[in-house]
Regions:
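Membrane-embedded alpha-helical bundles of multi-pass enzymes
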Residues: 1-119, 339-340, 351-354, 366-374, ...
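A generic secondary-structure signal
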Residues: 11, 87, 159-163, 320
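Active-site catalytic loop in hydrolytic enzyme cores
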Residues: 16, 37-68, 195, 228-315
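CN hydrolase (nitrilase-like) catalytic-core segments centered on the catalytic cysteine
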Residues: 26, 171, 178-179, 187-216, ...
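Class I S-adenosylmethionine
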Residues: 108-111, 147-148, 330
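Soluble catalytic regions of membrane-associated enzymes that act on cell-envelope
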Residues: 116-264, 293-300, 306, 310
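Amphipathic beta-strand/beta-sheet edge segments enriched in Tyr/Trp
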Residues: 231-255, 370-395
Length: 437
């Protein structure tokens, strides 16, 4: 896909000239990143703007532009540096390009400082404290996740939470697929572990957000994820967020952004045989069911956005949750599948960008790490270590003010994709029309 984007840039430059070609590059690449984030093979992990997740003081203006703004900054600076190097190698005047390069680097950083100060001043007027307990049980997904007994694991979860619960705790969060065995959603109350969670909720006076592997049965085939049963009914499996509230019906939200090749087989609607090559991740094999629309939970004390693992790398998905009223971002994940690689570190770091884009506190419960608490300015307030059992007490705030990015989403990416198509069509016309003369 990246090669196709550069091939498009090369084609435009060839037929419109160097000047227009280089001017088109930001539109080409931004448009590519936007398109790549919105098809069935989407993988926005590699978007250029993600690199600033470790330099959050430089990109506080992501609350306006999102990651696409960072991508645009990188492309513009690199274009200036390329032109500077080209002129220097040709012994041409470089003073103007050097000045422009310096301005392109400095202005966004200065703007970031001003934006951060402005936000920190405004947040003082909105203080609704919301205490959260984050549990990191550290269950080895390769050896314990699907073999440990549900009662033993439930007891462990509750004991860990007990160590940090206070009378002010509003929410307790357990990681993705903490309930790793599949069960029908309308039968959760019949499970032998159910009383343990209900008793804990009543004792704590706090709601529980927990990851679960769930199922639903349908009379008719609902989607490509529906599996036919011997009796002619259909079952769908889900990677779900489950909200357990005192004396109220349990609520479920299914993961919407599924991992390609593990939870979702791209375009299997058209090529059903592809379902047979799905990777076995220890649970249901093949495409999982997913939500039709973006949803949030209403807890007893405020609105939260349940973000399951891979969903946290999708800026527009999280922005839509905030548009729907989410006041706190809650990431649940099981990063143990990565092993001790840069993957889990990057995944944690990207969450800092979601906090800045939407100006929300973000709390993260990861099975094996890293769990953590991130402020609306992307600052890591506290974090756990990798592959260690831990519990964090998070003193956060519920925030409701919407940012430009929360309101309009990736407007830069959408606009760039549109302009890219126009430029590309125009360059095709320049190639074709001369041949007809």
């Amino acid at each position: 896909m990246m090669c196709l984007a550069f091939q498009s840039f090369h084609f435009i430059k060839k037929h419109l000239g160097n000047r227009k070609g280089y001017l088109s590059l930001p539109f080409v690449w931004l448009g590519f990143e936007h398109v790549h984030s919105n098809w069935e093979f989407s993988h926005p992990w590699l978007s250029f703007g993600n690199v600033f997740s470790v330099r959050t003081n430089w990109i506080q203006w992501y609350e306006y532009t999102g990651v696409s703004g960072g991508t645009l900054w990188i492309i513009i600076v690199n274009l200036f540096l390329f032109l500077l190097l080209k002129r220097w190698m040709n012994n041409e005047e470089t003073k103007k390009i050097r000045i422009l390069s310096g301005i392109a680097i400095a202005i966004p950083i200065l703007v970031s400082i001003l934006v951060k100060r402005s936000f920190e001043h405004s947040i003082e007027q909105e203080k609704r404290n919301f205490e959260v307990v984050l549990v990191q049980p550290n269950i080895d997904p390769y050896n314990e996740k699907f073999t440990g007994g549900p009662h033993a694991q439930t007891n462990k979860f509750i004991q860990l939470a007990n160590s940090k619960i206070t009378p002010n705790t509003k929410l307790v969060i357990f990681p993705e697929t903490a309930l790793s065995f599949s069960f029908f959603e309308n039968e959760f109350h019949r499970l032998s572990i159910y009383p343990k969670y209900i008793n804990a909720v009543q004792r704590w006076g706090a709601d529980v957000l927990i990851g679960a592997s769930t199922m639903k049965r349908f009379k008719n085939k609902r989607s490509k994820a529906s599996r036919e049963n011997p009796d002619g009914t259909f079952t769908e499996y889900y990677n779900s967020s489950l909200l357990i509230k005192k004396n109220l019906k349990n609520k479920y939200i299914h993961k919407s952004k599924l991992v390609v090749g593990v939870e979702k087989i791209p375009y299997s609607d058209y090529f059903p045989f592809l379902e047979d090559i799905a990777i076995d991740n220890g649970g249901a094999v093949g495409s999982l069911g997913e939500e039709d629309t973006v949803k949030i939970f209403k807890t007893s004390n405020g609105a939260i956005a349940p973000i399951v693992c891979y969903e946290s790398i999708y800026p527009e998905f999280v922005a839509e949750q905030c548009r729907k009223g989410a006041e706190l971002l809650c990431v649940i994940t099981n990063d143990g599948w990565w092993g001790d690689t840069p993957g889990y570190k990057q995944h944690f770091s990207f969450a800092r960008l979601r906090a800045i884009e939407n100006r929300r506190w973000l709390v993260r419960s990861a099975n094996t790490g890293k769990s953590g608490v991130i402020s609306p300015t992307g600052e890591v307030i506290s974090e756990s270590k990798w592959w260690e059992e831990d519990v964090l007490l998070a003193n956060t705030q519920l925030l409701s003010e919407k940012t430009i990015f929360s309101t309009y989403g990736d407007f830069l990416g959408r606009s760039a994709a549109f302009v890219w198509m126009l430029i590309f069509v125009y360059s095709i016309s320049k190639k074709i029309l001369p041949s007809r003369r």
